[in-house]
Amino acid sequence: DTILVSIMTANNEIGTIQAIPELASLVKANSRAVFHTDAVQAYGQIPIDITKMNVDLLSASAHKFYGPKGVGFLYIREGVNLPSFHHGGKQESGLRAGTENVPALVGMGKAAQLVNEILMEKSNMMSQLRDYMIHRIEQEIPYCHLNGSRRKRLPNNINISFSFVDGETIVILLDMEGICVSAGSACNAGQSITSHVIEAIGLTGSLARGTVRFTLSSHTTKEEIDRTVDALKEIIEKNRNLNAKYHIFLENNRH
């Protein structure tokens, strides 16, 4: 009875890249469902090849690849018939009534052109910085856990959980240093609840509450990475030293 299967190309919180071609083939071999992938996080970060992905629908949002806010696109494979989203005029092939936002559309098109011209160079550069930052954190800050795939991961995403320190505390104290990070997705910013994504991968308790997401850009530098890790080390050390459970843990784990 399923009419639609929708799977993220890459997760917005932990950066894991899904095996979309294989998943799409599996769905189509076992049903007549339309297959949609949400490529909002992935477009402009990794190569997107519609023909190889084998999808019926693909959506992306311009602000994720340095385009205007409030505009995106939906790829519809030829032969897939969709009803009108709302009734009125016949704009956008009769799917979405209303006057088109031409400046935003043109801006999105130009942003897509520019980001694809430098995609591989940008992706490789961010991957190197991402791996460098992960290495420094894992080597210099004990009791941390990298969330998501280490290999099949967006080049700009680092999601790490730290035991015995609250993620929101890290966010606030880094913000005071002029460093912007988040304790979850941008959609849930400001909510002091454990991310459902983090819970779904099995993290609980102190480790789950200590989750922080770092997002890089094509403008991020190695110097900024070093400054961030140095500030992060100091913040976590100071806050752990104020946590009685941390000292009990250390006492119980002395060899």
Task: Please identify what each model-predicted range represents.
Residues D1-H255:
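Pyridoxal 5′-phosphate
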